Amino acid sequence: MKRDIIACGQKVDIGTRVVLWSEQEGFECPNPRGRNSCSQHDPSLNDAPSEKFKNYKIKNPKTAYQELKENVYQLVLHYDVCYTSSHCHQLMRESPFKGSHFYLDLDGTLFQTCDLYWKTNTAPSDDKKGNERAVHVEISNLSWEALAKESEYYPSKQDKYKKTDKGWKLVLPQEYKTKILKRPFNAIPARTFGERGYFSKKVNGKTVRMWDFTEEQYKSLEKLCIGLNKLLPGIKLKVPFDKKTGRHPLDRLNNYSRFHGVLGHCHVQNGSTGLECKYDPGSAFNWGRLHRAFKKTKP
């Protein structure tokens, strides 16, 4: 069972299952790009239309790894607004430019879609340079699409989470149940809020209502962050935190382009420069949990 994440051929065992793009169950990034800050590839791959995956070749992996460590210092978290990672990949393939280095499925399975040397166009940030400095992970969660009254992409008469004797659980369509590697699997939120189950907070000016991610996702995410810090030390074990209020901010940061660590798409893009305003990983994400996990990690 593979547990490695890879950058320029360098590997780090993160202690949990990682399905690589080269495996039968894996997903190849449909739209990788070259990073402008790195030189060990054909520069025509930087912003050209997507080519066949095999055409993305690293010339000198050793030099490439040094360049990557010098230029990449953020892990950006996203909710994928999908049922599962296979659903997310399906939508990525339909786009001419979208991609993500990692998918994190409901059951905690991580998928790496390409070598981290390559850029994926997932979060341009308000300065339009965000993808150059970042690694991205799409975490399976429907966000507000799970609420029937707010659902736009997947219209339904009932909420997509159901309250049972054992608590809330996501009602997965059959076509997605069979695509999860750990079967059978019940997607249960790690935390719930009161009787309604979902969390509701303002993120970049919008009230975001959503159920939490799963316990399995949080456990794998913690390991991914720690592993990335070993592989790319510029990605510090640090999350946005306001010392004055003692809280984790949910709006775009003033210093978003200089922040070294783990942050959300909401922290780098509020639409102030003409791009779409972003809210992920949303109101339910437990930033405090990551913060505490990082504090316990030995340097």
Give the role of each language-model region.
Residues 101, 135-139, 221, 263-265:
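Active-site scaffold segments
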Residues 71, 135, 144-145, 155:
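Carbohydrate-interacting regions of secretory-pathway proteins
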Residues 1-133, 152:
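N-terminal catalytic cores of peptidoglycan-degrading enzymes
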Residues 132-138, 143, 197-204:
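Glycine-rich, often proline-containing surface loops adjacent to acidic residues and nearby aromatics
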Residues 122, 138-139, 143-150:
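Extracellular-facing segments of soluble proteins and assemblies that are Gly/Ser/Thr-biased and enriched
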Residues 83, 143, 270:
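Feature marks short, surface-exposed loop/turn motifs that line or immediately flank catalytic pockets
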